[in-house]
Amino acid sequence: MDINITIFIFLCAALLMLGVITTKFSNRLGVPSLVLYILIGMGLTSYIYYDNASITQLVGIFALIIILFKGGIQAKWKHIKPILGPSTSLATFGVLITAVLVGTCAKYILDLTWAEGMLFGAIVGSTDAAAVFAALGNKNIKTKLTSTLEAESGTNDPMAVFLTVSLIELINEPSTSLWSLPLDFVLEMGLGLLLGLLFGFLSIKIINNINLDSSGLYPVLALSLAIVTFSGTTLLHGSGFLAVYVMALTVGNNDLTYRLSIVRFTDGFAWMMQILMFILLGLLVFPEHLLAITWQGLVLSFILMIIARPIGVFLSMIGTKYTGKEKLFISWAGLKGAVPIVLATYPLIAGVEGSELLFNAVFFVVFTSALIQGATLSPLANKLNLAGPDQEQSPHILELVSMGKTSSEIIEVVLKEGSKVIGKELKDIYLPSEVLITAIVRGEQVVTPRGETILENHDTLYVLIPKAKRQEVKKMFQ
């Protein structure tokens, strides 16, 4: 084997290991892991010359598909439904207001044309799904706020992509008409929503009804369907990112075969893609170029975090049932991450004049946003009394892993208050002969099911069932 190939493989493995270890340090330091991944990439620029924006964009888009799929499949519709209106307003009007304000300031601070200034604003106007999901994942912040922020970050990428592509087209072709843009936006978002739902229900049918030779193939199938959703929707001129998130949300909130396997595989794969993506983004920038725009970058970061984002949030959430403190927290939690940097590669590839300055300025703003805002989310939530109770998650997960075809699966059933089986012994509960309770998780303990075992509120049951009886069995424990 070629020695260069071996070195490349070793380097990739070393970077992934370094990224995993870095995550442990980021939790202890209170710094978002993406900041450390970017620093790793920037530190390697002295040894590795890398300036391929096209490959970075391709990896970034692929990573965002996986991250959006992960976020959507783990989101609960019961949490999303009450905040759908506010999060949609944030993802559209909020992004637009933020983009215009930041773009106007960037025009004068960076000495850009109006179109270039608005392009900068469009690129940094949206929050980032990877950054928000990672920052909120282990924080004890109220569900209402985390759901709002996650829904916003999962749905505002299409707005930023649309504005970025439209402004690049306007810069390269000044004769482009602006009057058709609102209609184009509505059609693109509408098509993304409809195709996301269509692909979502189609994916459920495929995953639940296909009988594969190994359970390990189901997560691969699910991710393949997510990629097909993105590419198919994009080819039809719809919003591929919106379609992926809606598809994942649809799949995740319906009965799904091998759900836990799919979620665990997706979670691990998303982490790997995040590490790779942020290191590549760090490699793409040269530290000396950032130093040349230090004061401009700091001023724009300050304007975005302290002025533009809060104004966008407060204006787009007029009339909603959110307190001033909650709006303030949402304003501060608008983390930037991979999406703006990936979008900043669009003008580079399109050959827009001054695109290198735009890329470096975007990178500076994203880095400072992730570092400052990401590190202060929890203290701010505590200061504003918006921290919820610590969420205790059971360390135990049980699932049927089959080496071949099977018609059975293990489902997870959580006993909620009001369940008719709470307080009963297992021997007094009628279950079909082919249904078996294999384990009961109570807090951090695993209870062996016996006939005299009494079921309690919040118990998690792992039940072996025929796939065809999933709904019937779930109703027995309601």
What kind of feature is each model-predicted range?
Residues 1-392, 404-405, 456, 472:
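Transmembrane helical cores of multi-pass secondary ion antiporters/exchangers
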Residues 28-29, 391-427:
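Extended boundary segments
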Residues 85-86, 406-411, 437:
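Short secondary-structure transition/capping segments
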Residues 89, 412, 462:
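Short aromatic/hydrophobic contact patches that present stacked aromatics
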Residues 383, 429, 476:
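Residues that form generic nucleotide/phosphate-binding pockets
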Residues 416-468:
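Cytosolic Rossmann-like ligand/nucleotide-binding regulatory domains
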Residues 453, 473-478:
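Short, compositionally biased
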